[in-house]
Amino acid sequence: MSLLIRGATIVTHDESYRADVYCADGVIKAIGENLDIPAGAEVLDGSGQYLMPGGIDPHTHMQTPFMGTVASEDFYSGTAAGLAGGTTSIIDFVIPNPQQSLLEAFHQWRGWAEKSASDYGFHVAITWWSEQVREEMAELVSHHGINSFKHFMAYKNAIMAADDTLVASFERCLELGAVPTVHAENGELVYHLQRKLMAQGITGPEAHPLSRPSQVEGEAASRAIRIAETIGTPLYLVHVSTKEALDEITYARSKGQPVYGEVLAGHLLLDDSVYQHPDWQTAAGYVMSPPFRPRGHQDALWHGLQSGNLHTTATDHCCFCAEQKAAGRDDFSKIPPGTAGIEDRMAVLWDEGVNSGRLSMQDFVALTSTNTAKIFNLYPRKGAIRVGADADLVLWDPQGTRTISAKTHHQQVDFNIFEGKTVTGVPSHTVSQGRVVWADGDLRAERGAGRYIERPAYPAVFDLLSKRAEQHKPTAVKR
């Protein structure tokens, strides 16, 4: 199978230029003009369009068991929806139950993901600590291509990682060359505020953001960053949603600390007024953690992207239908938190970022693809347009439009947080492994076509930190 994309303007994270791209055997074989290609190659006309690396979503939760139910989007439907939106790879999460073997959970998630329509990888969550966990982390890194571990600082009495677990796991990540990531919310404070609001009779979705104010995220971000600084490991903060958390990242980076921030498309656009909707079901549809924030935080997050202190855009794609959300009808803390977005992320970011002048096209590529590939050691196999890279590409029509709606999206959920928004700039074609899987509204996703992509431990940042540590190595005082 071979494919020639002709006439498009190639846009990468650092340049744009006119050239044709020839793909065969799932990879990019040649880039240039007037390419000599074999007869019979499929030809796409990219005139007037941009050819960019396929999107990589570093934060999804397909088919996740949580709060007594299971996310409505499975690995096939979710990755297929991603292809319709220009996303050609995801990094999902293995979340072991407390006391469950990490390896057992990993193989369980691998089995679920075999139906994926696009390439995928995993972060593995550390939900408890023991010598077994410590050893299995090494097994996952050395034999299963895991180079990042997730820590939930929220969800008390469930999967929350207390400080002793953070310290032990961060230390182990440093030894293994794996990146620790954190969901930064103070779980003790959230639990306290949830009970307090319930006692006051505030039981609806409007209580959700009140139980998780911006200070809760700011404190946890600060704590995680300080722990990482003390131990000497890099740190990646998922779904940064507040100015307070961004300020902590910015300060740490100003001192040379390798801290990376991720922002969700929804947090860039929506504010907490959505929880005041008079219809309970609609308000509950927006419940996710961290919640959408008061006005002002959105501008701060855009500035974080522009300044380089936020590095990736994601979705935290975790779908629960209205019937599932109804479990919290009388207690907001029992509403399964999660929203969709994998199909919409790239178009929303283009419309609100590039079209508004907030971001350049090169910024867009970096934030939707290349930076994730670099941070999690997928680059240049992913996130790049160069000979030898995977032929995961999106042909982008800057004049194309789409009105987002749950009635027409491909995501397996009955709600869309961007409902009714018309975006300008959409994928006309998506290419995965050199095969056209989305063509002008025709979704050609294939169940099981996705591959598990191993991500080896990443030495670059860790070598740097090791040199720093050696220079400041403490010594005993001779007496």
Could you say what each language-model-derived stretch is?
Residues 46-115, 132:
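Metal-associated gating/positioning segment near the N- to mid-region
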Residues 206-234, 285-286, 306-313, 319-399:
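His/Asp/Glu-enriched, well-ordered alpha-helical/loop segment
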Residues 1-53:
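Histidine-rich, glycine-flanked metal-binding segment
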